[in-house]
């Protein structure tokens, strides 16, 4: 990922939140872009901001001393200033060199979270999204899972960047043409998956760490029957929390095992 920090303002509270979030969701590496350097005349101030960012990264177990830091100005680059255009190229080179290329999970059963749905006159309904794992070939059956009863359809076309393909694999952003499916029968938050490979659930157990106020989380405790939103791939669903017997409440900063009952079924895996 690219962490953007204003050279004029230095790390802000949301900078800490972004680093923490990156750590918690498993982002493997970060590259820093110090933006708006054209507004800073003092070289020592720039060095101070860079040191602050490196310290913050180290605080959350990123290798702060080793992370590439590129100083530039996005606005000046957009205005055609060659000096700052070079900095953007330098940034992208750092991304290529420092951030590991993700491995495509192509051998497992096909699964694609649905991001958007639209109709093509005369052709049918298209679901778009990024293939999370596996492969899909034209003519193969898939299940539409989550939010409603599971249904089955056939992928009659695969399109990427306005080109028709015979198949798609993990990492591809595609549109999948679905046979005999009405526009209202598929929606964001569902998944397309190889038949029998994943099932919808409304109830699950989870081990949870509750972010503290300093980490951008809660200010107050919560109790059983608390109803937060739970995020799954491309959607969020309300769930009712049940705390373990004998646990009256959970404070920010606590670890807890809880049972959650969702108000709609979602494709969930361990």
UniProtKB/Swiss-Prot annotation:
Claim: Zinc is one of the keywords in the record = no
Gene Ontology MF term list: GTP binding; GTPase activity; translation elongation factor activity
Any idea which positions bind GTP? 35-38
Q: What class of enzyme is it?
A: hydrolase
Q: Which InterPro entries match?
A: EF-Tu_GTPase, EFTu-like_2, EFTU_2, P-loop_NTPase, T_Tr_GTP-bd_dom, Transl_B-barrel_sf, Transl_elong_EF1A/Init_IF2_C, Transl_elong_EFTu/EF1A_C
Q: Domain tr-type G: where? A: 1-103
Q: Which reaction does it catalyse?
A: GTP + H2O = GDP + phosphate + H(+)
Sorted keywords for this record are: Cytoplasm, Elongation factor, GTP-binding, Hydrolase, Nucleotide-binding, Protein biosynthesis
Where would you say this protein principally sits, based on its record? cytoplasm
Superkingdom in the source lineage: Bacteria
Its cellular-component GO annotations read: cytosol
* Pfam short name (any one): GTP_EFTU
**PANTHER family in alphabetical order:** ELONGATION FACTOR TU, MITOCHONDRIAL (PTHR43721:SF22), ELONGATION FACTOR TU-RELATED (PTHR43721)
Q: How does it assemble?
A: Monomer.
Q: Which family does it belong to?
A: Belongs to the TRAFAC class translation factor GTPase superfamily. Classic translation factor GTPase family. EF-Tu/EF-1A subfamily.
Provide the function of this protein: GTP hydrolase that promotes the GTP-dependent binding of aminoacyl-tRNA to the A-site of ribosomes during protein biosynthesis.
Protein's name in the database: Elongation factor Tu
Organism ancestry: Bacteria, Bacillati, Bacillota, Bacilli, Bacillales
